[in-house]
Amino acid sequence: MKQYKILLIIADGLGDRPVSKLNGLTPLEAANKPAISDLLKNSMIGLMDPISPGVIPGSDTSHLSIFGLDPHVYYRGRGAFEALGAGATLKHGDVAFRGNFATVNNDLVVVDRRAGRKLEEGEELVKELNEKIKEINDVKIRFYKGTEHRVAVVLSGKGISDKVSDTDPHYEGLKVLESKPLEDSTEALRTAEIINILTRKVFDVLNSSEVNKRRIEQGEKPANIVLLRGAAHYIKLPSFSSYTKLKAAAVSATALIKGICRELGMNVVTPVGATGGIDTDYNAKAKAAIELLKENDFVFLHIKATDAASHDGLVEEKVKAIERIDKVVGTIVDNVGRDNLILMFTGDHATPVEVKEHSGDPVPILLYVPYPIINDNARDFNEKEARKGSLRIRGLDVTNILLNYSNRAEKYGA
């Protein structure tokens, strides 16, 4: 029996709700999608709950689920994945945080949680922090530049814990929070104290940085604090190949996703021009996926632009991003051949563009197979049509479904 290559395309934050600016259509409805529509002739569509109905997923927990790992078992916080994706090498016992370069006033009240989001000087600032803050109370500190305004911070040493609260207040106009222990332990208390010392040291370094003086002169907001959240102890995950028997690769420019995929043992490629934002080079990602499909059984293609547009409330940009993803689908199918490929297209969660945050809504999902199936005869691929389709699954079902339809699944039982 022929075994087919598998391509999983995730448009981050794809799911949406009717949008007033689109006369009640969702962005997926409004987008022109000729390549995706052409696949409907031999596809099943439906809805996926990344975690379970009504649960609002993080991008971390949803991707673990989609890759077949129950987040209730394997999730320990986002910080470690962000750090791995930003290039950190972690060892057992390290505690990692995800964070934002942000703007605060002299009273440490947050003015901009993302320092304008587009932070071209991030590498310079990370270098300066690493040169001037090496350790606190015998615990080594290391900073890693993430995507756009994001940064990861890793603590290495004895007697530290991930059971500490965030310093990120999550809203502008509020003061940077003091980290507090979340359990009654010496390790948690010690770690919270280290984080609070770190917050002040980071502010002192960044507030006097020549980089930020230059930004102010140019009329930009200074990136003068790092807001921390998502503390996580590093734990080793099983490799994707160990439970799927697939040789796997991924295309992504987003630190979190790269970190998860690397930890799962996938070959992760970030092509030149891929940014993890709205301005990403879609064609470069398509070409990378085409090349990886030559040598791998499974290729995961992640595109962040849809989520970035949603978080910023940019309706037209989300529609354009979906249309550009459609061109990616067409380019890959034309080059690889529709007879050689199982293709799944979905989102990792919904980010309604008028809400600007993740939601617990189910996400539309499409599964194309190159041989005769009982297809859904769908007229279009969108949230409304998906409700009429045959698929009603959880994220945890995705990997098994792909293995089944690619003729790679093993029998369960005698």
Curated annotation (Swiss-Prot):
Annotated EC: 5.4.2.12
GO molecular-function term, one example from the UniProt record: phosphoglycerate mutase activity
Signal peptide start and end residues: none
Listed pathway(s): Carbohydrate degradation; glycolysis; pyruvate from D-glyceraldehyde 3-phosphate: step 3/5
Keyword Amino-acid biosynthesis in record: no
GO biological process, one term: glycolytic process
Superkingdom field: Archaea
InterPro entries: Alkaline_phosphatase_core_sf (IPR017850), ApgAM_prokaryotes (IPR023665), Metalloenzyme (IPR006124), Pglycerate_mutase_ApgM (IPR004456), Pglycerate_mutase_ApgM_sf (IPR042253)
Keywords from the named record: Glycolysis, Isomerase
Enzyme class: isomerase
NCBIfam families, sorted: apgM (TIGR00306), PRK04024.1 (NF003104)
Task of the protein: Catalyzes the interconversion of 2-phosphoglycerate and 3-phosphoglycerate.
Protein name, entry field: 2,3-bisphosphoglycerate-independent phosphoglycerate mutase
